Structures are given as structure tokens and as C-alpha cells.
Amino acid sequence: MQTPTFYDIFKQLNNTPRPSHHEERVADFLCNFAQQYGLRYRRDAQNCVVIEKDATPGHENAEPVVILNHMDMVCVAKDGYLRDGHAFDPLSDEIRAYIETVKNPDGSESRWMKAEGTSLGADNGMGLSMALAILADDSLVHGPLEVLTTTNEEDGMSGAEALSTDFIKGRKVINLDSEAYDEITMGAAGAYLQIAHFKADWANVPDGYVFRRIVIDGGLGGHSGVDINKGRCHTNQEICRFIQNFGTDKMMVCAINGGTANASISSVAEVIVAVRPETEKALTEAVVAYNDQLRRQFATTDAGISMRGEETNACSQYLRNAGDIVCAFNELPIGMLKMRDDMPGTVMTSNNAGRIITTDSEVTISCHSRSFSNEEMRALGQGITATFKKYGAVNVELLMDTPAWVERADSPLVALTCQTFQDVLGFEPKKVAMHFVLEAAYYVQKYPGVEIASIGPLIIEPHSTSERVNLDTADNIWKVTLELLKRLA
């Protein structure tokens, strides 16, 4: 049987639908792969799979090494994209990859893999394919191996969170899920996600009022970990500031909504208000003035930001407690709150209020806090809870309390990985810690003494239909990984 390349395996993976929360088929694929090559494997209730491979003869006494990846992907398609005449179905349709050669500014060429009409799944399919290719190749030199593949990494990390403390034996973990080719990730912030619930205290809007929809949009938004220190407009924050500045004594708030995801910086927000006819002019002037202020304030970060008011359908009721809800929001610490002293350019602690939603029964506000200090993160979260309750929240729901992966400055594995990059590729990668949650946090918590180094090929715009992976960097990460395994043996 011919040994498959990791590109061969990646193609097989992309023939197996694997969106988050639907990993049964790809878990079957992994178990069948293990059986095909006569390897031991285990599968838990979350469909996480670990495949074991014995050491190369003569290296049996080496410390076991874990190669870590996740099997799920963010599967999105372009608007209106059809697959063989029907709308793309992530639960049944394969990913169709192709390779494009691009001319670089210096005249050289780069090879990129993309997908036809959908996200590619190089995050984390490329790393997983490399791990499986290592399992399939008996010519390689390595110690005892455990290839661990988790589920639902992209939408909650429930697979990693539920792992039993005896699921793996190794304490040296090579993670192939990084997306910056010239970096080694050696730490990550923890996360604390809360949802505040305010009861919607409705009252009837008196006759004779006029209704306006006030919208802030055109914000750049972004990832609330990666982009939180870039000074971008948080539209939820600005709409609440506007409401408080104008005054709920002069207008009735019928609904307030903003943001699309808890972990994203809000790029659009709106409020529906009712005002007396004699107040309409003042409201219009206030919107124009606030729009001018936003455009000046965010001219360099959010060039498309704008605020406008427009007529809208009448509402029968307004929120009597809107003033309290807005005050609660405006007391929240939002954005980058502290930078790390020991790692220039890295955010230490932040908070993002990514969504505010009005329903028939309640108004909810989400707060996604992050920090490299678990104590600081939880203290921040507790302060936010107190603020919400001070203004009448009936419940503050804690949805995530994930510990930080605090890097080990003296990690022998990280040092060896850096040296291997230098020897194989001629450069030493930058050592970084990420201001967002990574699965590694759970391994640090569950497996005392674990060391983790995360590397990977260059992946641009993951989780989108523009996702692409640089194949030249993938080839080089493959070389580094093989040499690293040899040195660990």
C-alpha cells in the first residue's frame, strides 16, 4: 500500500462533511483510518479520537509525544452559491479545493490552496492531515505517538473540556493548529462569557408620538481578541451612549439591538424610539451631531462608520427600564483594559460587549472578558455582574469560564521547536501568546506538567469563503514537524 501524502489525506478529509457539532462521520473516518493501518485508537462520548502508534524500533524509551488537532471546521458558503444545482449543504456536500499559483512582488511564485465557493477547512484540516500522514508512514523516526483529535473546537471547545484525565499519556504536545507560519504559540488568554438578562418592562406608547429608527453601521468590527486593541468603534457602546446623552426622559426606547456574535466587536447597532412631534427636530439634530463626532473619532479605524435616523413603523409599547439598561451598559469596561508588560503589543485583559438583543420578554447583553490572569479575569467578570445587578438584571448567566494557558518561559519543548525551525528553515520563529482562548488551556488544567508548542502553515482569512493556505509554508511545517519528532525520540 502506497503511503499517502498529507495532501492526499486532506482531500479525503474534505470529502467528509465536518462542521462543528456534526463530527460523527469524520470521527468514523479517523477510526477507520486507525484500523486500516493497524493502530490502536479510542473514541469518547464527545467523538474525540486518540490514535496510538508505537515508537520506531530503538526509540521505545522516548517520552510519548501528543500531536493535537481538531476535526471540526467552520463551514460557510458564499451567498447564492450552488453545488450541482442546489444550495450548498455543509452536512452532505464535500469541500472542493483547488490550487492557485500567485506571482509575488519580488517575482517569485507562491502556491495557495482555496475552495470553490466555501471555506476551505485548512483550519485545522491541514494540521490533522499531517498528523495522519505521520501515522501512515513507517519510514519516519519518532518515539511513542498519540494523535489526539478533538471535536467542537470552533464553537465552544466542548470536546477538549470533556476529555478524561487519562485519555492521553504524553506530556509533550505539538499542536498543528496555528495560522502564522513564522510564530510559535506558547500561551493564550482565558475567557469569561456572561449574558445579563433584564426583564422587558413594557408600557404603552401614548397617542401622537412619532417613531424613528436610529442606526450606527459601517464599523469594521473584528475579532474581540485579535482586534480589541485597535481602537475600533464598538457600535453597541456608541448607540447606548447616544441614548443616555439624549435622555430617556425625552424619548421612549422601543427596542435596542446590536452586534452579531459574542466574540465579535459590534459593527452595527440600532434603536427604535418614540418621541413627541415637538422633539423630533432636536432628535434629528442630535443624530447629525453624533454622526459627525463618530466620523471624526473613528476616521482612521472605521472609515465607513455612520449614524442616521429614519422613519419606521409605529410600536405599541416602549421599555420603561431602558434608562437602567443603558446606564448598566455605559458603566461596563469595554475594549483593551490592560497591556502585558513582558510581551510588547500583547493585550493582558479586555472586555467586549458584543451583543445586545431585545425580545418580547427581555433585553440581553453579552460580555466576553479575556485575560492572561485568571484572577484578574474573574475579578473583572464579578465586577461586571455587580454592575448589571445594580441596574436591575434578573439574572447574569455564566456561559464560559475557561482558564488561561500561561506560557512556560523555560519550556524545553518550545526551545527545541525554535532550534528546529532555525536548523531546518534558517530562521527562528517569534514566540507569541494569543489574546483568545485555545484548547491548550484545558490540557494545562487536566494534565499536570504538560508542555505545548503550537505551529502551523500560513492560513489567511480562516472561517470565511476567502480562506486559503500557503502550500509552501505547509511543506515547510511538515519538514519541521518530522525533524522535531526525530529530536524528541
Residue ranges and their predicted role:
Residues E60-R171, P333-R340, G345-V347, N476:
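Active-site metal-coordination/substrate-binding segment of hydrolases
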Residues M71-M73, S119, L148-G156, D177-Y181, ...:
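Acidic, glycine-rich active-site loops and adjacent beta-strand->loop/helix elements
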Residues D227, H234-Q237, R241-I256, V406-V450:
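Active-site-adjacent substrate-binding region
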Residues D341, M348-S350, G354-T364, H368, ...:
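Zn-dependent metallopeptidase/amidohydrolase metal-coordination segment
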Residues P17, R96, K103, S108-T118, ...:
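Midchain, well-structured core segments that form catalytic/ion-binding scaffolds
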Residues M348-F436:
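Substrate-recognition/cap regions that form aromatic- and gly/pro-loop-enriched pockets
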Residues Q2-W112:
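Acidic/His- and Gly-rich active-site-bordering loop/insert found
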Residues D166, G231-T248, T279-E280, D324-N330, ...:
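His/Asp/Glu-rich mid-to-C-terminal helical/loop segments that flank catalytic regions of hydrolases
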